[in-house]
Amino acid sequence: MASAYDLTNLSNLKTWLDIAGSEDDLLLSQLITQISRAILNILDRPSILPGNYLETYDGGNECSIILRQWPVNSVSLCGVNGVPIPPSPPIDAGAAFQAGFVLDGADSAPPGRMQRLSLRGRRFTVGVQNVQVSYLAGYQITGEAAMAPQAPPYAMSVLAPYGDWASDGGVAYANGVALSPVAGNPIAGQYVVQNGVYTFAPSDAGAALNITYGYVPADLAVCCMDWAAERYAYRSRIGQQSKSLGGQETMAFIVKDVPDFVAAALQPYRRLVTP
């Protein structure tokens, strides 16, 4: 069974390797999961898909802290010494600011960057484990505009501009009313999603929708496939650093824990600061 943390899928890897048969499907699936976990460890990130985090920090009388996960999609709680801090609305010209928390904006495309949570009108006062923040973070397309298909089978794929669909974040009508996910046979106000394909009820045909979903950045998916392909090929030359070809020439193999091309591509996604 595929792991929720896999950075690619079996079908994509087999296409990458130009493999048609199924004899090595189990091995390739295991490689995907192992390499995906190794990549997340290198990045020092528990996951790259949208998830909820509740984190505790030591206050140091600063105005800002750097949240540990990114990109941050929303903050549901900011508390100091047990006192909830409300969000501070944008500052209008000529108007006084309102005290509260402010989140740095996220980059529109991956890899993104770690974001600050700042306070207006107060500080993260000195204390041990006295600051709590609850937030949603991970690579996500929020509110992608779409129209429910008007012809059978009433199914559509998301645009996925930065990488393959990986998790559902909900569907809502343009007026903000949420649709409910179901396992099959949707009726009005319901939808089915599988591998990034959304299916709606005939009665919702033509409805204006906003779709939210998590995705795996294409860079990370390619890194996973490149590294898995390298490990798959390594089976035929385990322990070898070179091989003589008929005594006329020698083929040398580069044996490294992380291939150079993978390490370079992963660098922009790594956590460089541990707050």
Predicted regions and their residues:
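Divalent metal-cofactor coordination and adjacent catalytic microenvironments
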Residues: 1-275
